[in-house]
Amino acid sequence: ASALLSGVLTKAGIFGALIITADILPGEHRWGVLLLVLGAVTMVLGAAIAVFSNNLKYILACSSLSQIGFILVGTAALSLLGQHNALAAHGTVLYMMNHSLVKLTLFLLAGVVYCNTHALDLNQIRGYGRGKPLLHGLFLCGACSLAGIPGFLGYISKTLVHESLVELAAESGSLGVTAVEWLFLFSGGLTAAYLTKIYVALFWQKPISPTGKTWGTPMTVTALVLAALPLPVLGLLPHGLAEPVAALALPFVGGHPFGHAVHYLAWENLKGVAISLTIGMAVYFLFIRLVLMDRKGAEAVYLERWPRWLSLEERVYRPVIRGLYRVLNVVMRAVCDALDFLVLVARRTFLRDSRPRRHRSPRSAMIHAMTHGGQRTEQEAADRLGTILDTLRRMEGSLSYALLMACLGLCIVLVCILLYVF
């Protein structure tokens, strides 16, 4: 469920932002600036919370928050660059694809760890991956791609989005865009730092107790391999695979094709990821190991240093949800009371009770008309109709009927989208 939420459902909001950018507010400067600011704040805040956290699943969740910020920054560049948005368009589409595949891999891996250890705290699951080379390799595929290491899809997508910010800064001459570019690199460094934290804890520290060699069923291993394998394949074939895949979505996002080939391994493109990785290693060795870890005995213990008063969940999300619940409760109660009052007024004025009249139900009338009034025939028709209606009611209440209706609805939505796009 977490893999689907992070990898698939979070893209629903991004699709909405892309539709607004491409179709509703194309070229709108204020909309692009709003996305740029929101994306910058989101990518830094999510990555910072992930650095402080010790819970594997919470780190990955905050990482998703940060990665959505990266995608929003790419969407903002796509909007602000107008006709010159080829880098931003390709980068945003590939970033979405990379994030979905990476989080599918890492959340499935977190599920494997939890199912075998029944814990998610790094202090309790440390060393679980030691002696498991396939699990080690699958984690590295996801982590390296998310950190933007060359040879993986994440490097291609992150490079394109970063270079679109460089192009936007040069075109606009805005110090604000330059600041966002450096926040982009800094957030990339934080991404590398918290991924290194997970990697060292899972695969290099000594385990609390022996974990064994077996860690998943053949189906689990197959799912992880299928999720992780496209990351290096697309990363090693950017011109042959990654760019053509991104080009399929260009009409949807309002993007333009490349005017020239992109040299991904040129120093100008490698410089961005080199800066991010340098920042990441500095944060890991100078902050995480010195401030967020404490040596107790032979092994280091991860500490919770994030202030409780800065908890987004406790300070923002829960109060907002409680406030919305109370406001909507008052509104709905007022609407309900108003309807009751209107019904009462109507029954005492122009909708007073009339004298009872003999009334034949639609079902009885239909049976009477079908049988021309014959008593015995009416009884047989009533029994037959009752059987049909009972069968229909049982069908409507079954799970298969609900799934059939859901599939029919999805097909209708898909046809409408295809007709709209093509």
Kindly give the residue locations of the regions a language model identified.
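Hydrophobic transmembrane alpha-helices and their helix-loop junctions in integral membrane proteins
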Residues: 1-216, 230, 236
